[in-house]
Amino acid sequence: MTDKVKFSSYVNENFKSTLNKLAKNKSKADNSYHTKYITVNDYLNNFSEKTLTDVCNSVLKLKYNCDHLTPIILPKTNCLKHDFMTVDNTRLVCVPSVQDRILQKLFLEYLKEHYDKIYNRFCEYDHALNKDIHEKVVDTLDEAGKPIKKTIYGIRKALDDVTEYRSKYKYVIKADIVKFFDNINREIAVKKFEREFIGLNEDKELIAIFKSFVYCDAKLDYGDLKYKKLIEIYLEELRGKGVRQGMPIASLCSSMYLYEFDNLIIKNSIPYIRYADDFLVFSNSYDTAKKLKNHVQKNLKKIDLDIEKLVGEQKTRIYGAKDNFTYLGFDIIYNSRLQSYQRQIPRPVFDKAIGRIDSFQSMTKVKRECGNYVDFSLYLRILISGYTNFYSEDLATNGEEFKRDLIAASKNVRKKLITDNLNIDFENIGSANKRMFFFGIK
């Protein structure tokens, strides 16, 4: 543990540089999740010393309140193209505001710097948090196709480890903790953080800001209007409980809950990969795999968690050597031609994403759901950026194809709207008029 400065002072020193780092990621700096969402670039353009002073003072006075989260519906791999989207075949991800995202990032960095031993102990086996603890150097190609070495961590390392372990072990147990984040007790999470991290230090700033993060909820009006009823069901069910996925601190909460379980697995030298609450256990024997599955379930029940649902299809399964399965939203498949394992974006994700774009077949629907054509173009950009941010090109062999198909679908549906609904020959529209029609740019 290093000599501590107050968290409010740490925020004052590092907020602007963290904001600038976010802005340097040009592919995401203009991402918007609803019409009122303030993007990274918007926030940066309006940033001032007064903004920073107000943030720091609210942290110092223990009065910082998070903005509402933005609820986003993502289809699970079992959600097929024409399926009606429900809580069973989708997941809710909640995106914090730019300001709150920066504060949560700084909060985690502050813990790593000033409570490093405690932080590392909790996060050692969670790939969502152990960036500075476990890194991996892999061979890859640069943009010119030249072989280079690249250091990976986080979800990239977790997925790379999966393909590596898959080639070493015949069986894998894919464990799914039933509604893990939704079942986190907020009060217990805050008390555990206070006990494990703060102890006798009485760091009230950290406790107050952590509580603000944990108790933050999503706002229905910020969600996609097309899925308003589904989002409403989610938010009503989760009201006042759990920690929302999509927040940087969610993984810290999961690691605090699973700390004892991690140690039990590692202590027994069991091959194990965990990213937040999603984990895999490997074995070269089917009998051993069955015993490990029972071992996992027994020990999770000790902390009021389970990998078996009371009703419905069970998601925790044992997979054989060449069986395909999905992990962290990506298909892990065996390529018989290359005799190796690869990661791919599941086909149902293609179908569902393109289906959402193709559903706009009339200007009536555009006006009803988006208001006007300019906002419709913004809606498509938000939709595509949401998908491609998660299913990025560097994580899947078909990532580039996925992005290309979404962009093509977006162009085609707008072209069709012009041709079919306005009786205008798209090919005869000049480029300036296309810009005006698509984007409202003169």
Residue spans of the language-model regions?
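Reverse-transcriptase-like RNA-dependent polymerase core
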Residues: 56-85, 208-231
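Right-hand nucleic-acid polymerase module
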Residues: 97, 101, 105, 234, ...
